[in-house]
Amino acid sequence: MRPAQALIDLDALRHNYRLARQLGGGKALAVVKADAYGHGAVRCAQALEPEADGFAVACIEEALELRQAGVRAPILLLEGFFEHDELALIAEHDLWTVVATPWQVRALAEFRSPRPLRVWLKLDSGMHRLGLSPEDFRAAWLHLRGLPQIDSLVLMTHLAQADELECSRTDEQAVAFALTCGGMRAETSLRNSPGLLGWPALRNDWSRPGLMLYGANPFPQPSELTAQLRPVMTVRSRIISVRDLPAGEPVGYGARFVAERPTRVGVVAMGYADGYPQFAPNGTPVLVDGKVCPLIGRVSMDMLTVDLTEHPHADVGTPVQLWGDAPQVSTLAAQCNVSAYQLLCGLKRVPRHYSTPAHA
């Protein structure tokens, strides 16, 4: 079997959820969209369900996957519904839905639900992606709150630049949210992962931790709080070939690396088809049997190459760690000019192995 694999530490996942809930000071929806950021939504939800207040996914397909796996906790559709007929499925499977556009407000008002629905009304407080304008938000609140098909409303918005700690935009969005929601008696939801880790003064009833659940730092620099996160995913493989090159010889496609000295080259079974960044630069750290070795040459579809010159005992079969506790996924992402989100979600071909039972 090909040695590339992703080890998922469900104890670390639970630890990170507890930290998020503690920082939020209220309830927390664990965001498990995009297959739990590449970690496996079903297994992650099953691991968290005994203590999670609920889950958040992007769409109804992701929610139904969890329901079919036996997850009974509340599930919120972050993008709401895309077609009118999805409302019947939302009611049937007892899902919560975001309402973020005028047409969704109209569709919900026209829907004769067999059971009252819990709705999260979304304000565009400055991100300008999804969300109602302040005027439409207030009108929707007045219209929906008295309808028999509505059980309760939660008021929410989404922070656009909370990962930029020197930016005033987060405070401006929080003020806009508070002003628009003034006088509305309902629970609120504002803070995402960077909001929880970087903006302690913000308060709401429901937080929505995503990236931090998986142990990744949303900020360029670590802090006392981000240091408490535990990486959930460790990506490993093995050396599958070793060769010695004389000075002046190139390595890989495009001869991007040329040996300046006699160089011992190790080939690792991990490539960009597995989710490793294709344009990782020469020198990107790779952990070979616990020792940092530099990446050399262009990353191929199925393989990458490392300089083993300073690691003479490494050989075929030696274990390799691409990210985990070291290098951390956020650090690797920054070095490769991509986001940690991309790396985690892009791990499609690598089999996952879970370190603890889902219901531990």
From Swiss-Prot:
InterPro entries: Ala_racemase, Ala_racemase/Decarboxylase_C, Ala_racemase_C, Ala_racemase_N, Ala_racemase_pyridoxalP-BS, PLP-binding_barrel
Any GO molecular function: alanine racemase activity
Catalytic activity: L-alanine = D-alanine
Annotated organism of origin: Xanthomonas campestris pv. campestris (strain ATCC 33913 / DSM 3586 / NCPPB 528 / LMG 568 / P 25)
SUPFAM superfamilies per UniProt: Alanine racemase C-terminal domain-like (SSF50621), PLP-binding barrel (SSF51419)
GO terms under cellular component: cytosol
Lineage, uppermost ranks: Bacteria, Pseudomonadati, Pseudomonadota, Gammaproteobacteria, Lysobacterales
Active site: 33 (proton acceptor), 253 (proton acceptor)
Family as reported in the entry's similarity comment: Belongs to the alanine racemase family.
Names of the cofactor(s): pyridoxal 5'-phosphate
EC code: 5.1.1.1
CDD domains to which the protein is assigned, alphabetical: PLPDE_III_AR_proteobact (cd06827)
Protein name per its UniProtKB record: Alanine racemase
Coiled-coil positions: none
Example GO biological process: D-alanine biosynthetic process
Function recorded in the entry: Catalyzes the interconversion of L-alanine and D-alanine. May also act on other amino acids.
Pathway: Amino-acid biosynthesis; D-alanine biosynthesis; D-alanine from L-alanine: step 1/1
UniProt entry keywords in alphabetical sequence: Isomerase, Pyridoxal phosphate
Modified residues (N6-(pyridoxal phosphate)lysine): 33
Annotated residues for binding of substrate: 129, 301
